[in-house]
Regions:
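N-terminal amphipathic alpha-helix/helix-capping segment at the start of soluble metabolic enzymes
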Residues: 1-22
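Active-site mouth loops of central-metabolism enzymes
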Residues: 19-36, 59-65, 83-88, 108-110
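Structural preference for beta-strand elements that scaffold enzyme active sites
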Residues: 20-22, 47-48, 82-86, 104, ...
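Conserved, mostly hydrophobic/aromatic
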Residues: 24, 41, 49, 98, ...
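Glycine-enriched alpha-helix->loop->beta-strand junction motifs that scaffold or abut catalytic
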Residues: 45, 97-107, 123-132
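Glycine-rich, proline-tolerant flexible connector loops at the mouths of alpha/beta enzymes
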Residues: 50-69
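Conserved anion-binding
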Residues: 57, 111-138
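Alpha-helix-loop-beta-strand connector modules within alpha/beta enzyme cores
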Residues: 63-87, 121-131
C-alpha cells in the first residue's frame, strides 16, 4: 500500500487531520448564481468554493462557460465571503489567466497525460505558490 502524505493548505490554518471539502456549481453561469452558492458554502463553515469557468463541449453551439468573466465572479464572491476559489484548467494557454484570479487550479483525470498543460501549471504555481488539485474519478 502506498504511503499517503497529508499537508496543510496554506493560509487556512487547517489541521492535517481535517478533510477539505470543495463545493460549488459545475459551471459559473452568473454573478447572482455564484454568490448565492458562495453564501451557502460560507454558512456551512467550508473554506473552498469551486466552479467551472471554461466548459468545452462537443457541440460548438452549447454553453462554453463564461471564461474570464467567471473567474472575476469567483474572485469577487470568494473575497466577499472569505472563501478560497478553485477551478479546473483544461488549456495550457489559460494557466496564467486562471492563476491570476483563483487560489487553486484543478486538473481533471482526462488531462493527466496532457504534459504541456501540466508543465505550464507547474511553472505558474511555482511562481505563485497556488495549490493544485489533481482530481481523479468522481
Amino acid at each position: 500500500m502506498s504511503e499517503v502524505k497529508i499537508a496543510p493548505i496554506p493560509d487556512l490554518g487547517q489541521r492535517t487531520d481535517e478533510i477539505t471539502i470543495y463545493a460549488g456549481p459545475c459551471s459559473v453561469e452568473s454573478a447572482e448564481q455564484f454568490e448565492e452558492v458562495a453564501e451557502c458554502v460560507a454558512d456551512l463553515g467550508l473554506h473552498w468554493i469551486r466552479g467551472g469557468a471554461f466548459k468545452p463541449r462537443t457541440n460548438p453551439h452549447s454553453f462554453q462557460g463564461l471564461g474570464e468573466e467567471a473567474l472575476k465572479i469567483m474572485k469577487a464572491a470568494g473575497d466577499k465571503y472569505n472563501l478560497k476559489t478553485l477551478t479546473e484548467v483544461m488549456d495550457s494557454a489559460h494557466c496564467q489567466l486562471v492563476s491570476d484570479y483563483v487560489d487553486g487550479l484543478q486538473v481533471g483525470a482526462r488531462n493527466f497525460q496532457n504534459f504541456s498543460l501540466l508543465k505550464n501549471i507547474g511553472i505558474v504555481t511555482a511562481e505563485s505558490h497556488k495549490m493544485v488539485l489533481y482530481k481523479r474519478g468522481f
